[in-house]
Each structure stands twice: as structure tokens, then as C-alpha cells.
């Protein structure tokens, strides 16, 4: 299995590159992610607290074990490694069986245009607690790496998880050539919205800023140029006739409260993919 992770939320903090989505994928795959779904389970925050007492308030709350990864990654980058190289080295340290790839080696931070001005997505999420009204989500295009291109060329199917379509998946789709390659693959996505309610995060605000309905239909429309199948929660009221032509509708329990629910959803995805092969 290969996972292509969003790097649009990457941010330099206290001299180190923090890659929230990329690291969450690594920590989750390694079985050490915290119950908050970010950072490392059991981590401590004395360095973060000490920096704050010195007047250096960091944009994110970073634990000691998590910070060690950021320091190590940043040192590799300063010595000439690419983000892909650094990610491979970090993944190897956890002995991961899955291949984790950043969507690009370029630094392409996502910014949010709001009534408080344009800001990095982490400032919108953490500093402003998602409160400002949103008029635009800006995802800068990055260059596709050879590793990502090869992974996509060698696969038959692509699964898009139930992440925020605009700010988590959108930056990946904005990588040069990504949407074109996906048109030649079987692509299945899991909707992160039930009825008109996002499962978590500011997906609603971000979709509205793109003129999309806050619904599974809006998700399908955003992916419509390459999507073959959409999994929605069994409580959703969308029907097959609502979807754009060429997209098949499936239903499942899409809320992942824990590992058992996650496994059940993964099993359903594998079943659908097996039926398509």
C-alpha cells in the first residue's frame, strides 16, 4: 500500500518543518498516534511550554517526541535531502510496511482568504479556531515527484479517504498532472459529510467558498472529473440519481470511532475494489 499525503498544511515552527498530515499518517500507520489524531501518544510538552514562557508562542502544540521528528527532518532537508527522502528515512525508523509519500517536494502552503485577511491554514485552524468567514482557499500547485508518479502508474485503484475535500485532498489534486493521471485509474472516495454536516473540521466553510453544496453531492462534484465510485454513510439521504453520470454510489458506516470501525470500512472498500477488478 502507498499513501500520498497532503503537505499543504506544512509550516515552519521554531526553525523546524512541521508536516501535520504527513506525520499523522506515519504515526497512525506506526500505531503511535495520540487519541486526538495528531502527535504521538504519551508525549509531553515541556519544551513547548518553556518556549511560551520565554515569549515564543508556537502556532501548534508540539510534544517532545514529535519535535524530535521535526528536528531530524529539517536537518535532513538542510543537508540536501528532499522531503520524499526524509519521509522515507523517518518511515524506515518505524519499520512501516506501507510506503508513505509526500504529495510533492515543493513547499506549497495552503492559505485561507478570510474577513481577517489571508492566513496560513494552521493559523486559521488553531489561532483563529476556524471562526473567520472564508472567501477562498488557495492551494499552490506543486511539482509531482517521480515517486508519486511511479506509484500512480503502477496502481490500478486509488482510494480517497474521508478528509476535507478542499484543504486536505484539494492540495494533492492541485499537484501538476494529478487529476489527469487519476482519470485513467479506478478512483473511489469516502464522503466526509453526512446529510449537510461535515464529520469534523471546516469542510462546510471551505466547500461553500468554492460554490459547492455542503453535502456528499458537493464532494462528488468536486471529484467529478475522475471519480468512479463514492461511499456515503448509510444515514445520508443522497441517491444514485443525484450523482453525476459515471459515479456509482455505495453505502457504509463511515464514522470511524475506533480501530474496529476503521477495519470494517476498510473491508468494505476492499470488497468494492475486488468487485471492480
Q: Which positions does each model-derived feature cover?
A:
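C-terminal functional extensions of proteins
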Residues: 200-277
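Electropositive, gly/pro-rich neighborhoods at or near active sites that engage anionic ligands
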Residues: 6-141
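Active-site glycine- and acidic-residue-rich loops that bind
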Residues: 139-141, 164-175
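Short acidic, glycine-rich surface-loop motifs adjacent to enzyme active sites
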Residues: 155-166
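Short gly/pro/ser/thr-enriched loop/turn and capping motifs at secondary-structure boundaries
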Residues: 8-13, 194-198, 256-258
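Short internal beta-strands
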Residues: 2-6, 186-193, 229-234
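A short, well-structured juxtamembrane/interface segment
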Residues: 85, 140-154
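Redox- and metal-dependent alpha/beta enzyme cores, enriched for Fe-S-associated oxidoreductases
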Residues: 170-210
Amino acid at each position: 500500500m502507498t499513501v500520498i499525503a497532503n503537505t499543504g498544511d506544512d509550516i515552519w515552527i521554531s526553525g523546524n518543518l512541521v508536516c501535520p498530515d504527513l506525520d499523522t499518517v506515519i504515526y497512525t500507520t506506526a500505531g503511535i498516534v495520540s487519541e486526538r489524531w495528531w502527535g504521538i501518544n504519551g508525549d509531553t510538552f515541556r519544551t513547548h511550554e518553556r518556549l511560551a514562557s520565554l515569549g515564543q508562542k508556537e502556532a501548534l502544540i508540539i510534544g517532545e517526541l514529535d519535535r524530535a521528528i521535526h528536528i531530524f527532518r529539517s536537518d535532513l532537508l538542510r543537508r540536501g535531502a528532499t522531503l520524499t527522502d526524509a519521509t522515507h528515512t523517518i518511515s524506515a525508523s518505524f519499520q512501516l510496511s506501507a510506503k508513505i509519500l509526500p504529495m510533492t517536494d515543493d513547499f506549497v502552503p495552503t492559505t485561507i482568504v478570510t474577513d481577517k485577511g489571508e492566513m496560513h491554514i494552521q493559523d486559521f485552524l488553531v489561532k483563529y479556531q476556524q471562526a473567520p468567514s472564508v472567501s477562498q482557499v488557495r492551494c499552490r500547485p506543486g511539482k509531482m515527484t517521480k515517486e508519486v508518479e511511479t506509484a500512480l502508474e503502477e496502481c490500478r485503484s486509488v482510494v480517497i479517504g474521508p478528509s476535507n475535500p478542499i484543504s486536505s485532498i484539494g492540495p494533492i489534486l492541485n499537484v501538476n498532472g494529478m487529476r489527469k493521471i487519476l482519470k485513467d485509474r479506478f478512483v473511489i472516495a469516502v464522503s466526509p459529510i453526512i446529510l449537510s454536516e461535515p464529520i469534523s473540521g471546516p469542510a462546510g466553510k471551505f466547500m461553500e467558498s468554492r460554490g459547492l453544496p455542503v453535502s456528499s453531492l458537493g464532494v462528488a462534484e468536486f471529484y467529478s472529473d475522475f471519480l468512479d465510485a463514492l461511499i456515503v454513510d448509510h444515514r445520508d439521504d443522497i441517491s444514485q440519481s443525484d450523482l453525476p453520470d459515471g459515479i456509482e454510489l455505495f453505502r457504509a458506516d463511515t464514522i470511524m470511532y475506533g480501530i474496529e470501525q476503521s477495519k470494517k470500512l476498510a473491508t468494505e472498500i476492499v470488497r468494492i475494489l475486488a468487485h471492480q477488478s
